[in-house]
Amino acid sequence: MTTTIRLALGAAAMVLATIPYLAFAQAPPAPAQPQAPPQPMGFFISSVGVGDGANLGGLAGADKHCQALAVAAGAGTRTWRAYLSAAAAAGQPPVNARDRIGSGPWYNAKGVVMAWNVAELHGDLERDRNNVRKPTALNEKGQEVNGVGNQPNQHDILTGSDSHGRAMLGAANTTTCGNWTSNAEGRAMLGHHDRLGGANASWNAVHLSSGCSQANLVATGGAGLLYCFAVN
C-alpha cells in the first residue's frame, strides 16, 4: 500500500513538473516587431563617368549624368546633383560643391548614413565625422567602387573642391578643367573615396589630375567618376 502511494505521488510530481514546460511549448509566438522602412538612397558614386574625361558638359551636364544613373537605379523621383565646385568665370561668382547638395541626411544604396548634414560631411566642427569610405561609398547599384588594391584602381573622384567643399582659388582650368568643359588642357582636383594614397587621404581633395582627358584621369587612378547627392 505504501509503495503504491509513493508511486502515485511520484507520477503526480512528474506531471506537475511538466506543466510549465508544456505551457511554454504551447504558448503562441510573440508578434513580430514592425521593421522600420529602409531609408531612401541619397548618395552614390557614379558607376561610370560621362566618358569624355573632365568634359562633363559643365555643372548642368554632370547633374544630368547623376540624375540619369539615379533613374536607372529606381531613385529618379529625387533631384540629384553632382558634387562639383566651379571657379569664378565670365563675370559669374564661384560655385561651391557644398552649396549644391541639399542639407542631408544622405544614405547610401543599402541604407547606411553617410553624413547627417553639410557640416558633418565636411568636418566643420570635427574632422572625419562622415562615412565616406570604401565599404560604404557605394555606387548607385549598391556595389563597392574599386580603390587601392583593385584592378583597375578608380578611387580618384572629380570634385574641383577644397576639403571644405568650396571652389579653389585660381582660373577655371587649374582645378576644374575649365569648369567641367575641357577634355584637353587643364587640371581638376580629385578626392579619394577609399581614403588611401597621398599624404592627405581626403574624400574630396587629395591631388590634381595630370590633365583633363579620359586617359589623363585613368593614368592617376580614376575613371571620371562623380559623387552624386540628392538635394531633397
Give, region by region, the residue ranges found by the protein language model.
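Secreted/extracellular ectodomain signature
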Residues: 24-232
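Bacterial N-terminal signal peptides
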Residues: 10-21
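Intrinsically disordered/low-complexity terminal segments and short unstructured peptides
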Residues: 1-3, 17, 135, 158
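Bacterial N-terminal signal peptides that target proteins for export
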Residues: 1-12
